């Protein structure tokens, strides 16, 4: 049985033409106008792509620093030692460690948003796969979180880097700001995401690549984008 939406959602939904594709700036403004959460809600974009995720070369995964950030303070941890640990601390990492950090997570601590590791630490970090993997926190070279340049990785994470990846149905969902953001800044963030997804088009894909895109705020209805207006 489908979950019945509340009155605030229904009122917001009435302001959206479900048959219309909105120009990007108009869509962003509309989502801001109809947001009703009693906190500064996040705005997210969802791209539906014409990809076969059973094919390894059609699985998208990566990271991008949004020009205007995400509005969220990221708690960043780094698995490193020696000079790399020092560099991570100087770059602003919240927690830096080696075996001690691995043990802390094994004991159930998960109060962080981004995990970064130097390549030599991955055999140890790999033991955390069952914990970090399902939560999307496992360091990965494709997202720039397995790297020797931990200072840059920490700076990027703190500056508003977001990660993206296709789910099994070819969808990519990424947050790109808060309702409180200026409309133009949200549009700039959204355009950055659209550009990175478009450039990541697998060579083997034929026909239309981005089939559909919509944006929504936390709890709010989605608004379909006119992809020609990017």
Curated annotation (Swiss-Prot):
What Gene3D superfamilies does UniProt report for this protein, alphabetically? 3.30.190.20, 3.40.50.790
Give the organism the record lists. Limosilactobacillus reuteri subsp. reuteri (strain JCM 1112) (Lactobacillus reuteri)
* Coiled-coil ranges (or none): none
- Provide the Gene Ontology terms for cellular component: large ribosomal subunit
Q: What is the protein name given in its UniProt record? A: Large ribosomal subunit protein uL1
Q: Which family does it belong to?
A: Belongs to the universal ribosomal protein uL1 family.
* Superkingdom field: Bacteria
Q: Which SUPFAM superfamilies match?
A: Ribosomal protein L1
NCBIfam families linked to this entry = rplA_bact (TIGR01169)
Q: What GO MF annotations does this protein's record show?
A: rRNA binding; structural constituent of ribosome; tRNA binding
The gene name reads rplA
Q: Which UniProt keywords apply?
A: Repressor, Ribonucleoprotein, Ribosomal protein, RNA-binding, rRNA-binding, Translation regulation, tRNA-binding
Is Ribonucleoprotein tagged as a keyword? yes
Question: How is the subunit organization of this protein annotated in UniProt?
Answer: Part of the 50S ribosomal subunit.
Q: Does the keyword Membrane apply?
A: no
Q: What does this protein do?
A: Binds directly to 23S rRNA. The L1 stalk is quite mobile in the ribosome, and is involved in E site tRNA release.
What are the BP-aspect GO terms?
A: regulation of translation; translation
């Amino acid at each position: 049985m489908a979950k019945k939406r509340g009155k605030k959602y229904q009122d917001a939904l009435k302001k959206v033409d479900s048959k219309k594709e909105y120009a990007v700036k108009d869509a962003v403004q509309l989502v801001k106008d109809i947001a009703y959460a009693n906190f500064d809600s996040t705005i997210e974009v969802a791209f539906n792509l014409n990809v076969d995720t059973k094919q390894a070369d059609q699985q998208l995964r990566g990271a991008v620093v949004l020009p205007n950030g995400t509005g969220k303070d990221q708690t960043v941890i780094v698995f490193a030692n020696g000079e790399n640990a020092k560099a991570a601390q100087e770059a602003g990492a919240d927690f830096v460690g080696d075996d001690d950090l691995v043990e802390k997570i094994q004991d159930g601590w998960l109060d962080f948003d981004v995990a970064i590791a130097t390549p030599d630490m991955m055999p140890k970090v790999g033991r955390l796969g069952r914990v970090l993997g399902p939560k999307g926190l496992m360091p990965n070279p494709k997202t720039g979180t397995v790297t020797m340049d931990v200072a840059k990785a920490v700076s990027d994470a703190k500056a508003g880097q977001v990660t993206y990846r296709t789910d099994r149905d070819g969808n990519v969902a990424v947050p790109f700001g808060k309702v409180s953001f200026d409309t133009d800044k949200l549009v700039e963030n959204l355009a950055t995401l659209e550009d990175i997804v478009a450039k990541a088009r697998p060579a083997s894909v034929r026909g239309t690549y981005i089939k559909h895109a919509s944006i929504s705020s936390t709890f709010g209805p989605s608004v379909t984008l006119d992809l020609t207006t990017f």
